């Protein structure tokens, strides 16, 4: 942890953080939630595996003792047809998680049975498997039976669950009374997690069908908004987020999503973003992502101290969130001139999410600004290994090579222009690149 981060965390502990019996703060458990193996079921029932993962995610989001690591962080290891013990172990290590939650489904004497499992990290490399009690789910009672599963996992992982927390978790884990609507929702979420234009369009169709079956399905409205946002349908996304808040004014996620929209709006809507993030935090004080958003909004308004305070709370509630370390990396260098703290924050973000292009770009820019051109080239090159068409990395690499190898810089500018000239948003930058290219060619002729 950086020196400044240590000082930041020395403040008063925010409400909602779990305490041990001795009164010391207990870090939340970082968990990866995997779809349950449903290959033993008939094809039309296999959506239940993803459905259980969604139930666990919704329920555990209501407890301050857990932070969830996005399944997208596992893309480097691929997506197996079913997550068994070997896949769970690989997921645990890849995500640097404290535990992975998974399991399988089968039918016994015609009745559906859920077989929940978990794998905990012990020490540096050891693991401890946990097997929970089988959960029978008679026909017509699946959603009711699954609602208690998040609290059961919490207790199995030795995380205290007070009665109000258990009630809140169970309520969140039972978002609709219609199994048909929940099936569409689970299938839609599975499609959106696969990513890509076609899968997101499939997700839109499935989530819309979930809402047709149950118009009061708040979580489905929110999820539909998220997918619309991914597709670039900004206004449709906003409509779904607002529908969620109208159906359930206590649901925090859409307020945070609206904050994100305000932050990315063409106009400067930072005050509205602060209001939306603050509302999400009011509803769920330990909502780490909302604290990060609030920090970003305050930083955009020029309130550096307010931003740092928000990031501080985000770190307490979720110390393994790469986004907060990314934001700290930006503010340390740009606003406070703290080189070492910035580098360490960016490196921590990359350690937590090796595919974070933004963190690698930020680290490269800090190195470049300090004249560490070899290190900057290394970071920009890693960005291009992950995304060969990343125009920011192509542009920055060309600039850096101007300092160390003009001939290579010419090749880099030519490559940037080939890629970026097809993109309207890059037009002004392409014009600048052509000026650099002409200047370099003239210099080499002399």
What is the predicted function of each stretch?
Residues 192, 229, 256, 263-265, ...:
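Position-specific recognition of the canonical hydrophobic site in helix A of tetratricopeptide repeat
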Residues 181, 218-219, 252-253, 288-289, ...:
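Helix-start (N-cap) detector for alpha-helical repeat units in TPR-like alpha-solenoids
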Residues 21-63, 175-181, 185-192, 215-218:
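A structural "domain/chain start" motif
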Residues 54-55, 59, 66, 72-190, ...:
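Catalytic-center loop of serine/cysteine hydrolases
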Residues 179-213, 230, 260-264, 296, ...:
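Alpha-helical segment of the N-proximal tetratricopeptide repeat
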Residues 198-205, 230-243, 264-279, 300-313, ...:
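Structural signature of tandem alpha-helical TPR/SEL1-like repeats
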Residues 213, 247, 283, 317, ...:
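Structural marker of alpha-solenoid helical repeat scaffolds
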């Amino acid at each position: 942890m950086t020196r400044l981060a240590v000082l930041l965390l020395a403040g008063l502990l925010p409400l909602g953080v779990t305490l041990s019996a001795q009164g010391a703060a207990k870090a939340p458990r970082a968990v990866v939630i995997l779809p349950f193996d449903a290959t033993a079921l008939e094809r039309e029932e296999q959506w239940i595996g993803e459905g259980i993962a969604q139930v666990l995610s919704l329920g555990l989001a209501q407890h301050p003792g857990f932070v969830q690591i996005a399944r997208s962080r596992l893309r480097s290891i691929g997506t197996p047809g079913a997550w068994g013990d070997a896949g769970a172990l690989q997921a645990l290590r890849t995500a640097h998680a404290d535990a992975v939650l998974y399991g399988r489904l089968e039918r016994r004497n015609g009745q559906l049975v859920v077989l929940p499992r978990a794998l905990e990290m012990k020490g540096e490399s050891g693991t401890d498997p946990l097997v929970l009690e089988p959960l029978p789910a008679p026909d017509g009672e699946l959603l009711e039976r699954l609602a208690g599963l998040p609290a059961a996992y919490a207790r199995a992982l030795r995380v205290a669950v007070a009665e109000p927390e258990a009630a809140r978790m169970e309520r969140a884990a039972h978002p609709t009374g219609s199994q048909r609507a929940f099936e569409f929702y689970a299938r839609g979420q599975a499609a959106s997690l696969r990513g890509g234009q076609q899968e997101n369009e499939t997700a839109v169709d499935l989530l819309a069908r979930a809402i047709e079956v149950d118009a009061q399905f708040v979580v489905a409205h929110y999820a539909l908004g998220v997918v619309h946002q991914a597709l670039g349908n900004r206004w449709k996304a906003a409509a779904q987020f607002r529908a969620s808040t109208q159906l359930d004014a206590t649901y925090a996620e859409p307020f945070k999503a609206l904050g994100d929209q305000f932050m990315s709006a063409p106009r400067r809507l930072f005050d509205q973003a602060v209001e939306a993030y603050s509302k999400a935090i009011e509803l769920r004080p330990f909502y780490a992502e909302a604290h990060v958003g609030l920090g970003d909004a305050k930083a955009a308004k020029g309130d550096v101290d307010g931003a740092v305070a928000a990031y501080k709370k985000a770190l307490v509630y979720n110390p393994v969130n790469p986004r907060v370390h990314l934001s700290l990396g930006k503010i340390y260098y740009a606003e406070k001139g703290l080189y070492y703290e910035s580098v360490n924050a960016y490196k921590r973000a990359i350690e937590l999410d090796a595919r974070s292009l933004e963190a690698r770009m930020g680290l490269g820019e800090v190195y470049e600004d300090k004249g560490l051109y070899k290190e900057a080239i290394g970071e920009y090159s890693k960005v291009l290994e992950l995304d060969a068409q990343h125009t920011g990395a192509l542009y920055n690499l060309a600039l850096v090579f101007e300092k160390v190898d003009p001939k290579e810089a010419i090749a880099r500018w030519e490559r940037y222009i080939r890629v970026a000239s097809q993109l309207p948003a890059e037009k002004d930058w392409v014009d600048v690149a052509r000026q650099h290219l002409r200047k370099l060619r003239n210099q080499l002729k002399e």
